């Protein structure tokens, strides 16, 4: 470049001034020649930064070179210094300007990345909503077709999944729709009706009915001695073991809208009610005996206060007919796969035996839900063995004066939730018996001397 060459000439001129051709007198005020320093300074001041063709082209380099060469010859030190300072200031300003532009570009790139993430999350959310809407629309179409077939007294036929999906993918007018979602009759013209997938109670022949009744009788006889020999667990309500799913399915009937509304109202999670308390209440309220198909379950609406749980419950796979509790349990394990993921409330002490039994059954319930699929021999929360985590949690929520007794009770090897609940209930039974000390309130902190609560009678 010409600029380094000018600097090299300037250094050589400093050490060998005799090489200069011009003298300082040549640039005297009386001369009419134009001062190259002033001419170059004017060009620099009027040049636009950094888009000017003058500042970015060969014209600037040549002007700088000739100006430095002139000052080297006339030995004008001040002019050379001012020129260098002017160029240094110009380069510094350009550098600061470019640095600001780069910073703005980086901020813009970060904003675009953040917008991309937000847009991706929004798209996923809308995609999930669309899937839920398609699922609900499919269920409504099947149910409407079932109602129309009953009104028009048409024979029962199997629902065609392809026709239902085709209706969802295009505009659908329920007023003009002819209700054709059934599979086509085979070429032989067989009039034997097949069951639609949404019907709950199939019509059985006399032979199959006789076989089913015989199977029920054998099942009841086999279950009778087991129920009698099992330990009776005393809870707030009597515990009734559910029948087999096949028996409950055969007894399934179509619920009316009033029944579904009442069922949803009684099993909906209450305000400030923890999820573990709510799921145990559904179990105790007969949720394990209330048989529903998927359409009836979806008709109940959101039952939990957790929005993510409700979304999962609306998209559970259709596995036929099952109990209300099983529908909720299937969504539960997807929302909270382990007991650690279920956020527990602040530790609260329980002040009565009934509350302690209820609290222990809640711990057993959430433990059972997480291992329900791998432990089919456990038929309820009462069959769950006391684990170390359950023991620590339960003892931590116990009053300080009761901890030693409760801890020693829970340390028995292989003891279950039902066994502990039964032993705690024995304290209530003992407190009901009259003694010389008199009767005490059931489950209160003032019980007989046989229990570790005796010193709390005055509290």
UniProtKB/Swiss-Prot annotation:
Domain of life: Eukaryota
Role this protein plays: Retroviral restriction factor that prevents infection by gammaretroviruses. Acts by interacting with the capsid protein ca after entry of the virus into the cell. This interaction presumably disrupt the capsid thereby inactivating the viral genome, making it unable to enter host nucleus and integrate into host genome.
Region of interest (Disordered), ranges: 192-269
Outcome when changing residue 399 to V: In strain: AKR/J, C3H and DBA/2; requires 2 nucleotide substitutions
Sequence ranges of Basic and acidic residues compositional bias: 213-223
A GO-annotated cellular component: Golgi apparatus
Name of the protein in its database record: Friend virus susceptibility protein 1
UniProt keyword tRNA-binding, yes or no: no
Keyword Acyltransferase found: no
InterPro entries (alphabetical): Fv1_restriction_factor
Polar residues bias (residue ranges): 226-238
An annotated GO BP: defense response to virus
Keywords, in A-Z order: Antiviral defense, Host-virus interaction
């Amino acid at each position: 470049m010409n600029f380094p060459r000018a600097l090299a000439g300037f250094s050589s001129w400093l050490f060998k001034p005799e090489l200069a051709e011009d003298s300082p007198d040549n640039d005297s005020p009386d001369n009419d020649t134009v001062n190259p320093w002033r001419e170059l300074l004017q060009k620099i001041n009027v040049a636009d930064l950094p888009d000017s063709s003058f500042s970015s082209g060969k014209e600037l380099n040549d002007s700088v070179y000739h100006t430095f060469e002139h000052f080297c010859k006339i030995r004008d030190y001040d002019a050379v210094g001012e020129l260098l300072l002017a160029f240094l200031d110009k380069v510094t300003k350009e550098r600061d300007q470019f640095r600001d532009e780069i910073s703005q570009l980086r901020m813009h790139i970060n904003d675009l990345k953040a917008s991309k993430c937000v847009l991706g999350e929004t798209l996923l959310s809308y995609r999930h909503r669309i899937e839920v809407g398609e699922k609900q629309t499919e269920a409504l179409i099947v149910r409407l077709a079932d109602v129309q077939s009953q009104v028009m007294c048409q024979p029962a036929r199997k629902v065609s999944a392809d026709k239902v999906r085709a209706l969802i993918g295009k505009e659908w007018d329920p007023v003009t729709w002819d209700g054709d979602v059934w599979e086509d009759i085979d070429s032989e013209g067989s009039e034997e009706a097949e069951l639609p997938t949404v019907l709950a109670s199939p019509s059985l022949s006399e032979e199959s009915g006789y076989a089913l009744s015989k199977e029920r009788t054998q099942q009841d006889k086999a279950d009778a001695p087991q129920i009698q020999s099992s330990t009776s667990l005393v809870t707030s309500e009597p515990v009734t073991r559910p029948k087999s799913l096949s028996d409950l399915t055969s007894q399934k009937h179509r619920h009316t809208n009033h029944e579904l509304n009442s069922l949803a109202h009684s099993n909906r999670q209450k305000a400030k009610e923890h999820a573990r308390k709510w799921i145990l209440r559904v179990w105790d309220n007969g949720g394990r005996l209330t048989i529903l198909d998927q359409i009836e379950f979806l008709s109940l609406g959101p039952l939990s206060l957790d929005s993510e749980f409700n979304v999962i419950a609306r998209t559970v796979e259709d596995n036929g007919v099952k109990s209300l509790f099983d529908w909720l349990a299937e969504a539960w394990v997807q929302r909270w796969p382990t007991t650690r993921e279920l956020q527990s409330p602040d530790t609260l002490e329980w002040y009565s035996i009934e509350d302690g039994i209820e609290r222990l059954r809640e711990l057993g319930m959430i433990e059972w839900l997480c291992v329900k699929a791998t432990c089919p021999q456990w038929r309820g929360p009462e069959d769950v063995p006391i684990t170390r985590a359950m023991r620590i949690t339960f003892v931590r929520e116990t009053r300080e004066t009761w901890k030693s007794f409760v801890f020693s009770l829970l340390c028995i090897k292989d003891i279950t939730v039902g066994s502990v609940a039964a032993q705690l209930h024995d304290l209530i039974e003992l407190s009901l018996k009259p003694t010389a000390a008199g009767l005490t309130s059931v489950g209160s902190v003032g019980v007989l001397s046989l229990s570790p609560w005796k010193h709390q009678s005055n509290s």
